[in-house]
Amino acid sequence: MDEEYDVIVLGTGLKECILSGLLSVDGLKVLHMDRNDYYGGESSSLNLTQLWKRFRGSDTPEENLGASREYNVDMIPKFIMANGLLVQTLIHTDVTKYLNFKAVDGSFVYKKGKIYKVPATDVEALKSPLMGLFEKRRARKFFIYVQDYDEKDPKSHEGLDLSKVTAREIISKYGLEDDTIDFIGHALALHNDDDYLDQPAIDFVKRIKLYAESLARFQGGSPYIYPLYGLGELPQAFARLSAVYGGTYMLNKPECKVEFDGSGKAIGVTSAGETAKCKKVVCDPSYLSEKVKKVGKVTRAVCIMSHPIPDTNDAHSVQIILPQKQLGRKSDMYLFCCSYAHNVAPKGKYIAFVSAEAETDNPEEELKPGIELLGPTDEIFYHSYDTYVPTNIQEEDNCFISATYDATTHFESTVVDVLDMYTKITGKTLDLSVDLSAASAAAEN
């Protein structure tokens, strides 16, 4: 422990593991520590016994649920956009060789008590029961504009400067109805609330393009992929990457106290009486609680079922977004389901999660609209956690703290945080312009 490191990373959550991998590849000397004796921190996957211990305090799940080891239940359930930032990061670092992915069957949106497949192209818009005949034509024109839009080709802009025009203005140009705007903004562009409407349209259009391009990657029913054996595989894969490039890992290290010099700069980490020196500290909010502030709360139901979610074409894996307006909420609700098809449960079992930003203190009542879509459940667990963002000035204390994972069921916001932290730590932007055709994600069924 007496050595000096460029960076000490505390916590083995996905964000911390991606960063330690990227920094190790950059040639920095990295020490990675965790107070837990397992990888993943808040973003780990639990077997059935661990799940019971965490939520029920006892170690004896019902026998009819099957073998404990066949369960890998994500604590932060998120799917991966097939053409998104996480896949680009996986390919950029060659971490794909440690993982096996499988396409996700379905992507749905909730409207007036029913769920519908999310249309993402002009062709799908014409077939979708989400819209009436005239609205389909308007939506088709909008989708064609988005598909043809190329930032570098002014001819495709139709006279609109998307860095100045708001999303609301571009939507009104096509005369789209409120319900259509709802599913485009929330189920395609994946915005969590309606703030995006008054922001420049460029991000909105890019997000829809990303969805459509991801959908086209696998010709499947959704734009998402997901690792076999659950998301707990991801932190471990990036940890292996870090180790290959000389990173040092230490699990089960008690306390992990960050040490500061007289000017308030981080200079090392002490655990069990030994101090390792460093120039910078990277960690999740739990390691430096005095340098973060609470900004909200995520509430989630974890459900074990013996059937797929009704009305999803018997999908073995599926995302359903319940837009805020449909529920009279301030932010969206998310439904995520996976099963034995991704090796996260025994044959015939499905794991479903209903997640939302908490707006009340009653998760059972608040998550009801999502839970009602599931049909009968074998077991249901509720949990909530506070969300934090850093408040420190990194240049002054050399501490780089990740934000807590949000309620969304996709990884885009997570990786934006990671790439932003990478830039602050290294002073450079990570170039992800890699050949995406090299992806090893297999679109099996």
Curated annotation (Swiss-Prot):
Record keywords: tRNA processing included? no
Task: Drop me one GO molecular function for this one.
Answer: Rab GDP-dissociation inhibitor activity
Pfam families linked: GDI
One cellular component (GO) term of this entry? apoplast
User: Which Gene3D superfamilies does the annotation name?
Assistant: FAD/NAD(P)-binding domain, Guanine Nucleotide Dissociation Inhibitor, domain 1, Guanine Nucleotide Dissociation Inhibitor, domain 2
* Organism domain of life: Eukaryota
A biological-process GO annotation: protein transport
Q: Which UniProt keywords apply?
A: GTPase activation
The cross-references to InterPro entries, in alphabetical order and at most eight, read: FAD/NAD-bd_sf, GDP_dissociation_inhibitor, RabGDI
Q: Which SUPFAM superfamilies match?
A: FAD-linked reductases, C-terminal domain, FAD/NAD(P)-binding domain
Summarize the protein's role.
Regulates the GDP/GTP exchange reaction of most RAB proteins by inhibiting the dissociation of GDP from them, and the subsequent binding of GTP.
Family under the similarity heading? Belongs to the Rab GDI family.
According to UniProt, the name of this protein is: Guanosine nucleotide diphosphate dissociation inhibitor At5g09550
Query: Native species of this protein?
Result: Arabidopsis thaliana
